[in-house]
Amino acid sequence: MPSTSFPVPSKFPLGPAAAVFGRGETLGPAPRAGGTMKSAEEEHYGYASSNVSPALPLPTAHSTLPAPCHNLQTSTPGIIPPADHPSGYGAALDGGPAGYFLSSGHTRPDGAPALESPRIEITSCLGLYHNNNQFFHDVEVEDVLPSSKRSPSTATLSLPSLEAYRDPSCLSPASSLSSRSCNSEASSYESNYSYPYASPQTSPWQSPCVSPKTTDPEEGFPRGLGACTLLGSPRHSPSTSPRASVTEESWLGARSSRPASPCNKRKYSLNGRQPPYSPHHSPTPSPHGSPRVSVTDDSWLGNTTQYTSSAIVAAINALTTDSSLDLGDGVPVKSRKTTLEQPPSVALKVEPVGEDLGSPPPPADFAPEDYSSFQHIRKGGFCDQYLAVPQHPYQWAKPKPLSPTSYMSPTLPALDWQLPSHSGPYELRIEVQPKSHHRAHYETEGSRGAVKASAGGHPIVQLHGYLENEPLMLQLFIGTADDRLLRPHAFYQVHRITGKTVSTTSHEAILSNTKVLEIPLLPENSMRAVIDCAGILKLRNSDIELRKGETDIGRKNTRVRLVFRVHVPQPSGRTLSLQVASNPIECSQRSAQELPLVEKQSTDSYPVVGGKKMVLSGHNFLQDSKVIFVEKAPDGHHVWEMEAKTDRDLCKPNSLVVEIPPFRNQRITSPVHVSFYVCNGKRKRSQYQRFTYLPANVPIIKTEPTDDYEPAPTCGPVSQGLSPLPRPYYSQQLAMPPDPSSCLVAGFPPCPQRSTLMPAAPGVSPKLHDLSPAAYTKGVASPGHCHLGLPQPAGEAPAVQDVPRPVATHPGSPGQPPPALLPQQVSAPPSSSCPPGLEHSLCPSSPSPPLPPATQEPTCLQPCSPACPPATGRPQHLPSTVRRDESPTAGPRLLPEVHEDGSPNLAPIPVTVKREPEELDQLYLDDVNEIIRNDLSSTSTHS
């Protein structure tokens, strides 16, 4: 394959080399006239022999050579400089046959000479020294690379010895990066003109130094690193060479396709002696640069990984003026390491190369400045110990140290963990909730102030149950308010508010790329903090949406929560972490003006039967607004969804009346939490509001004085004179028959089914009715009705039999026994309406006469529905004054134990009822039932 060659005229100026050639000293065997050059393979394998002149090879575009090693296109034409170009370096060589520069021993098959002009191939002269005008290898430089990776040598041009290489008084050929290096005509022509070659592949000339792309990835250093000096060139050019120097200003200039140092043109001898031609160092580097030498920001930063090794070597050679100085002195300030401490030792495998190859190598931690000559480096990156080339141009600044208060132990839970709000005696509670709307401020505008509370002021958070004297740190961050699990919000961050009106101190910290506001909880303030120092900052949507793995959209995710977290140390050494989140906060001004907003609801729980009216207070309600009840699974999916009926006639912009829909499961045994929202359109929904469905089949029993009139939804006119007392008398759950057939009062239509459950709360717990016995003084037993009474003496507590359907009780559910059984004694004629089985268990053989009405203790059951007929004839005759003695010594009353989950014990517990003295008006359910039935009997008799 024909290779690209550079035709050179016979008068080739070689400067001082002319003297050597003139004396007839040859550097190799005399070539025969018309001889041909050796092939590349033969020259490569015979490189170390003494009869072949080693020289500086200029790699050509050979088919067997990798392109990155040569970077020369075969299509690039050779540059033929004019023959009359002035030399300027030394005497011109007048004559000499072309074959003088060629290797001998071969001719073309047709007998023609191999080349009309010599082909110049320049190779490294490192490892060669002058001995009787012959070049010999003191150390095989090629041993650095494996034989399979060596570049095959081609025909070479013999050059003189190192002493005759240059004249110290003349211009430095090394200041130019041209491949002619001896101030040839082409070199001068190249130095004066710049060529638009963007890369080494398009350049017609080759650099003698190691190409930046010749780095061997397996060995970690360039192939020709042994041919490059690392301790700097011994002397710089005293004169000007066009753009040969690399200053601090041009260090980040345009990046060249060639390194910034000649590297191979001036060397120390390998035996440790400094060559005599350069006894002193040039005080300053060349003020100008040669073509394609300057390094710019664009090319340097864009090609950092390609040119790291060669660019570092080039920079050191170009900027080092004294070999005894530290290598860092010649490195630009912008390229040095930011740290000032020197590494304790530079682990280098260096071996002095001299006549005695068996001498032991120096210690590995030998300082590099103690060597005045170049050392043979087998492994490691010497320059990397002094230069840290960054992969990004903006990583020079040191990271900001974390404050001691922001240090978090790795054992503390992450911000996206779901933590409880109470554990044991500790409870973290938001005493005052924040306002449902807060205008978050952008990064480009000023603060919008701290988050405020709905009733004025600011949110308040308190830790209950903490009795120690050590303060704790309350953490606050902005969390999500969507259907998914609580986590830090991607588009909003907490913002620290300061000013004269801010009374709470705070500190900002960064935890897992989330800004956290730390607020102290002080024991002298009862572990209570007023959150008047927290605002909300809106981040730029594009910055967050372009993150890897981010799927949320900023404009659709404008609701947040204030998430508070505290870590309580335990005596065992562990840390208890509590977390509580506020109500959702709308941060978008547009959303606050268009989306419906629910601020208050009249009720937050109701039995599963539904049907009650609920009033919603808020903003942006319309006539066509819909209220949707939904039940969500733990993973966020909707299990149940139901649209509630709204009263359009009563709808106002700030209020909405809705009927609670029945729940999907009417037989729940524990409260079920659901949510509802108001919808004005497809994308105009309010925030989710919580609602609780309660189990059915439990009556509502209240204790009401007669002088405090308040209507209640009770059965018949009896309830018109009743009102609830402020204090409940028992908190257990009682049961009522689920079907109308369990009503034991004959002559009246059965009550429709009414299933309710009252939780153990003071506001809604079952209470007793306080009725006067005067309303029942005209009662006479009727043969056609069941007559109930309490004849047992004081202190007697008869055992209660387990009957299928006792009075005012029910079995609850098929697998659940009756939670309460009331002791009753029934006396009735055979015409009684009691069932046979129930009559046998409740009616004893000896009937007992009823007690006088004045001594009876009446009670009243909460009715099933307002449609029931009146239970008494004259409720208006109730006395206006009733004796009340709330003595706690009224006597024990045992009821079945009810667990927190709402399910009673599996086995029924006997109920013990003690008769109260006559002066006490504390009535119980069984007493009231007896009085009611007696009164009903008397009313029927008189009618």
UniProtKB/Swiss-Prot annotation:
PANTHER family: NFAT (PTHR12533), NUCLEAR FACTOR OF ACTIVATED T-CELLS, CYTOPLASMIC 1 (PTHR12533:SF5). Residues 703-943 are annotated as: Transactivation domain B (TAD-B). Keywords: Activator, Cytoplasm, DNA-binding, Nucleus, Phosphoprotein, Repeat, Repressor, Transcription, Transcription regulation. It is found in: Cytoplasm; Nucleus. A motif (Nuclear localization signal) lies at residues 265-267, 682-684. InterPro entries: Ig-like_fold, Ig_E-set, IPT_dom, NFAT, p53-like_TF_DNA-bd_sf, RHD_dimer, RHD_DNA_bind_dom, RHD_DNA_bind_dom_sf. Member of the multicomponent NFATC transcription complex that consists of at least two components, a pre-existing cytoplasmic component NFATC2 and an inducible nuclear component NFATC1. Other members such as NFATC4, NFATC3 or members of the activating protein-1 family, MAF, GATA4 and Cbp/p300 can also bind the complex. NFATC proteins bind to DNA as monomers. Interacts with HOMER2 and HOMER3; this interaction may compete with calcineurin/PPP3CA-binding and hence prevent NFATC1 dephosphorylation and activation. Interacts with TLE6/GRG6. Residues 22-48, 200-298, 787-912 are annotated as: Disordered. The keyword Zinc does not apply. Plays a role in the inducible expression of cytokine genes in T-cells, especially in the induction of the IL-2 or IL-4 gene transcription. Also controls gene expression in embryonic cardiac cells. Could regulate not only the activation and proliferation but also the differentiation and programmed death of T-lymphocytes as well as lymphoid and non-lymphoid cells. Required for osteoclastogenesis and regulates many genes important for osteoclast differentiation and function. Residues 118-123 are annotated as: Calcineurin-binding. Residues 439-446 bind DNA. Phosphorylated by NFATC-kinase and GSK3B; phosphorylation induces NFATC1 nuclear exit and dephosphorylation by calcineurin promotes nuclear import. Phosphorylation by PKA and DYRK2 negatively modulates nuclear accumulation, and promotes subsequent phosphorylation by GSK3B or casein kinase 1. Expressed in thymus, peripheral leukocytes as T-cells and spleen. Isoforms A are preferentially expressed in effector T-cells (thymus and peripheral leukocytes) whereas isoforms B and isoforms C are preferentially expressed in naive T-cells (spleen). Isoforms B are expressed in naive T-cells after first antigen exposure and isoforms A are expressed in effector T-cells after second antigen exposure. Isoforms IA are widely expressed but not detected in liver nor pancreas, neural expression is strongest in corpus callosum. Residues 276-288, 846-855 have a biased composition (Pro residues). This is Nuclear factor of activated T-cells, cytoplasmic 1. PROSITE patterns: REL_2. The gene is NFATC1. It holds the Pfam family RHD_dimer. GO terms for cellular component: chromatin; cytoplasm; cytosol; nuclear body; nucleoplasm; nucleus; transcription regulator complex.
